[in-house]
A protein has these predicted regions:
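A glycine- and charged-residue-rich anion-binding loop/surface
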Residues: 1-442
Length: 442
């Protein structure tokens, strides 16, 4: 309601495309959806001016930053939105003094912020055109976001871009930037814009009069209400930093431009310098050296797995020999060290079961703890199953003390938990579960 009351006093004169500052009058202030008479130091309110050079967030472009000052007050602009058509609302923090409706003010956009925003938005158009030049006309933008120094663009494409394709897109974009192409904006009718091939976002609604932004004429021609540089060279160098999936048939590229590009370059250089010092090779030999180390690491891990498996299985005989007699059934219930995973533990359980006599019932239940979690596996032989002993039932009996769950078939079952301290109690329940089954089937 407050916005509509302010809108009735007249539309905001939006001059962000042509100016970075303006003298204005405070038309009103809003807090919590209600009109208020004023705001004092430390408070945050929404403020409406009769004229503003501040760009309101839209079209994927972040809002401007800056200050609004007047006789006895200073405001920091932290956000700018257009909640209803024709009304620009500034979210401000009162840095000093007191502001009230009717006061005269001077609105000043942060010049560095705006330059960065223009670089990023024009850079978005350049990347879009480069994608279409490299991939073809089906690579069509479906959304974007840009703020000073950073841009991301979502586009239709069925698969990940190869490293070579990504490099080609980046090269085409930077060639267009270095070509110092003119950037021009003009208003025309929507039918005329479509006739000359201006690209529009699918699903977006447009007025009958639209704004077209061109970079190098027809090379890049899009419907756009954002702020832009005057020549492509002002975008500065551009680096595509990532390319990812954002859904079926949709990809996203992210890039840095201007000052943020140089920050990225410094970080990459520091990374390479660190690698060359650590690996003690020149920069151009880093990939080969890393690959060599990875190959050696994989070989070492493979050998470690082999030795670990041998060590685990070496204990199978001792475990089988330590089986307890529970109602005529040989029961092995133990915790094994080494932090075995489910697969390794299963192999050990089956090995121990194979060492038990097939002429009498046999149950093997082993548990292992690793990284604060519990793995447990149970296996029964055929003789035990004939006595109605089920591995699945035993696993379910073990689960509560270790805060877990499990299940499986009558011959093999497994589970996991999050309370390793409950392992001793869980192993005691194995003997109880077997004894109950054997006595019940007798």
């Amino acid at each position: 309601a407050a916005y509509r009351q302010l809108r009735e006093r007249g539309a905001t004169d939006f001059i962000a495309h042509s100016a970075l500052e303006a003298d204005a009058t405070v038309l009103g202030l809003v807090r919590d959806g209600e009109l208020v008479s004023g705001a004092t130091e430390g408070e945050q309110v929404e403020l409406v001016l009769d004229v503003t050079p501040f760009y309101a967030e839209s079209g994927g472009q972040d809002s401007d930053a800056g200050t609004i000052t007047g006789d006895g007050f200073e405001l920091e602009v932290v956000d700018v939105q257009r909640p209803i058509k024709g009304l620009v609302v500034h979210t401000v923090r009162v840095v000093r003094g007191e502001v009230a409706a009717g006061r005269s003010a001077h609105a000043q956009v942060d010049r560095e912020w705006r330059l960065g925003a223009c670089q990023a938005h024009s850079g978005t158009h350049v990347v879009h055109a480069a994608l279409r030049q490299v991939l073809g006309p089906t690579a069509l933008q479906s959304g974007s976001y840009n703020r000073p120094g950073y841009l991301r663009l979502d586009f239709s494409w069925p698969q990940q871009l190869s490293a070579d394709t990504r490099s080609e897109v980046e090269e085409v974009a930077n060639l267009a930037i270095r070509a110092d192409l003119p950037v021009q904006a003009f208003y025309t009718s929507l039918p005329e814009a479509r006739r000359i091939g201006a690209l529009a976002l699918f699903g977006e609604t447009y007025d009958e009069e639209v704004r077209v932004v061109e970079i190098g004429g027809e090379w890049s021609r899009e419907l756009c209400g954002g702020t832009h540089v005057l020549h492509s060279s002002q975008v500065g160098p551009l680096a595509i930093t990532s390319e990812t999936s954002v859904g079926a048939g949709m990809r996203r590229v992210e890039a840095l431009v201007g000052r943020d590009f140089f920050g990225y370059l410094r970080r990459e250089r520091a990374l390479v310098d660190g690698l060359t010092q650590t690996l003690r090779v020149p920069a151009d030999q880093v990939p080969e050296r890393v690959q060599s180390l990875l190959d050696r690491l994989r070989a070492a891990e493979k050998e470690l797995d082999r030795l670990r498996a041998e060590s685990v299985l070496a204990g199978a005989g001792a475990l089988a020999a330590a089986a307890k007699d529970v109602g005529g059934v040989a029961v092995v219930a133990a915790e094994v060290p080494g932090g075995l995973g489910g697969g390794e533990l299963r192999s050990l359980v089956l090995d121990v079961r194979g060492r038990l006599s097939p002429d009498r019932g046999g149950v093997v239940a082993l548990a292992s703890r690793a990284d604060g979690k519990v793995n447990f596996v149970v296996a029964t032989n055929e003789a035990a199953r004939l006595q109605q002993v089920s591995a699945g039932e035993v696993v379910r009996a073990m689960a509560p003390p270790v805060g877990g769950r499990g299940g499986g078939k009558d011959d093999v079952a497994q589970g996991g938990g999050t309370e390793p301290d409950g392992i001793p109690q869980a192993l005691q329940l194995v003997e109880a579960a077997v004894g109950q089954r054997v006595s019940g089937s007798a």
